Amino acid sequence: MCSDIDEARLKAIKAMFPAVEVTKDHRALLADPRIDAVCIAAPTKFHYQFTKEALAAGKHVLCEKPLAMTYEECMDLKAAAEKAKKILMVGHVFVFNAGIRWVKEYIASGEVGRIYYAHSERTNLGPFRYDVNALWDLAPHDIAIFDYLLGEAAVSTSARGLKCLGNSLEDLAFATLDYPGGKLANIHVSWADPRKVRQITIVGEKKMIVWDDLDTLGAVRVYDKSVERTSKYYESYGEFQLLSREGSITIPKINLAEPLKAQGQYFIDCVQNGRHPDLVDAEKGAHVVRTLAAVQKSMDQGGNLVRI
C-alpha cells in the first residue's frame, strides 16, 4: 500500500504497479493489520511525526534521512521503537554503497595507515528544495559516510553558509568536522554549482583513496602515495625535511550493487529475523542530526566553533 497527498503521484504509482493499493490518508495505511513495516519518504519536517505514529501503530519503520530535525526528537523515536519492540532504521543509503563499503574494509585492513583528513564534495546546479537548506538536504549523506568510515562521530565543527540564489535558505555550505584523534573532515555541499560532483577523498599516512560516485570506469581509486619525515639532519632545511613517495594508482574490482536495493534488503532481513539494524540504527541517525544541528548553529554564528 502507498500513501501520498499528491493525487498525481498516486495515479502514477497505480499505473506502474496495479496491484498496489493507494490512499491519501496515511492513517488508513497505519491502521491496516496486513502491513508490518513502512518506509517514510516525506518532507523532513514530517519525519518525526510520521515515524512516531507508525511506531505507535505497531509498524517497523525505515525513515528517510535525516531521522528528525533535532537530536531530542531522534532519541524520543529511539525510545518509542524500543518500547514498541519494533525496528527503526534510518535511510543513510551510502552506507550500502559497494564502493564505500570497500573503502571501509580497506581502511580497517591497515593499508591506509593513520587517517589524517578527509573531504567531500556534493554539488550540482539544483535540484532546489524549499523545506530544508542545502546542508540538511545533502550533508546527511557525507556525515553518515564519514562516521561510518572513521568508526566514530565528530566532536566539534565550524561552518559557513551562503544564500546566493535569492533564497531564504542556504544554497551552499562549507563545514569542517573535528573527529577524535585530531582527524579532520571537510564537507562542501551546494545547489549553486556548475558541475555535478559526488566525491570523497581519504588521506592517510600510507595511502590515499578517492571515491567518485559518478565515475563509470572505477568508483574507487587507491593512490600509493605518502609523505614522511627523514631522520637525517639538513642544516639548509631545518631539523628535518619531508619526502614524498609516488606509487601506483589502483582501481580495485568491486562488485557493484544498487544501494537502495541493498538498503531495502537489509531492512527486510532485520524485520524478518528480529535483528537490530546496527549499520543505520536510530542512535547513528541521531548522531548525524546532532552534527547537522551543530553545523547549522556554527553557520548562524558566522563560523564559530561549536561542540557537538
Region locations from a protein language model:
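Rossmann-like dinucleotide-binding domain that binds NAD(P)(H)
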Residues: 125-195, 201, 215, 283
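Beta-strand-loop-alpha-helix segment that lines the small-molecule cofactor/substrate pocket
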Residues: 37, 43-95, 110
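Conserved SAM-binding strand-loop segment of SAM-dependent methyltransferases
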Residues: 19-26
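C-terminal glycine/acidic-rich active-site capping loop/insertion
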Residues: 93, 206-279, 283, 304, ...
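C-terminal capping/lid region of NAD(P)-dependent oxidoreductase domains
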Residues: 86, 297-308
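Hydrophobic residues in well-ordered beta-strands that form the structural core
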Residues: 24, 63, 88-90, 119, ...
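NAD(P)-binding Rossmann-fold cofactor-contacting core
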Residues: 1-16
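Rossmann-like NAD(P)H-binding beta-loop-alpha module
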Residues: 98-120
